[in-house]
Amino acid sequence: MGKRAFGALFLAILVTAPAWAEQPRSPFPPIEVSDLAGQTYPLRNLLGAATVLNFWATWCGPCRVELPELQKLSNELGGKGLVVLAVDVDLPPISEEGVAQQLEFIRPRIQTFLSRTGITLPVYLIDGKTQAVLGVDRIPFSVLLDGEGGVVRIYPGYSPESTRDLRQQVLGVLAERPKQGGK
């Protein structure tokens, strides 16, 4: 790309950025999540001023690296409105027996993982059908939501760079809070 073309592109982005920034964000689909006791909650009831949904599994190597970093982020910014939800995707599509019987198998693995790693993030579960509907086709898979449940950014996979970017995006969403009337 030539210097003029690059300059024109940069100028176009600069001029349109304020208009783009004011566009409403796409809402995250209305889903329900289950806690480790089998209680079901609408996701919208769990949102903070900024919410990170981290889809993970106990057997996922990159998840084992990313979750402690998200725990640190939660420890740092939780008092400022950040909520980090660890959403385990070990459940297969819910069968007729429902979540309760499947939880009996999965719960001990999750609890062992949490105790070994010191992770204290709230853990919720979704089943394989919900995972497919959401398009979570790899893990870890993180989604940053604003206080209204709008999708700010999606992070498929893990890298140190994506974690740094996530932190910056979270700070940006938290800084927007007064403009949104606070939450």
Predicted regions, residues:
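Bacterial N-terminal signal peptides that target proteins for export
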Residues: 1-7
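Bacterial N-terminal signal peptides
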Residues: 7-17
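N-terminal "domain-start" segment that seeds a small globular fold
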Residues: 19-44
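Hydrophobic beta-strand anchors of alpha/beta hydrolase catalytic cores
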Residues: 52-53, 84, 142
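Conserved redox-active cysteine motifs that mediate thiol-disulfide chemistry
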Residues: 55-72
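Short, flexible/disordered intra-domain loops and linkers
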Residues: 92-104
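Short, internal strand/loop/helix patches
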Residues: 102-141
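Thiol-/selenol-based redox modules, centered on thioredoxin-like
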Residues: 141-183
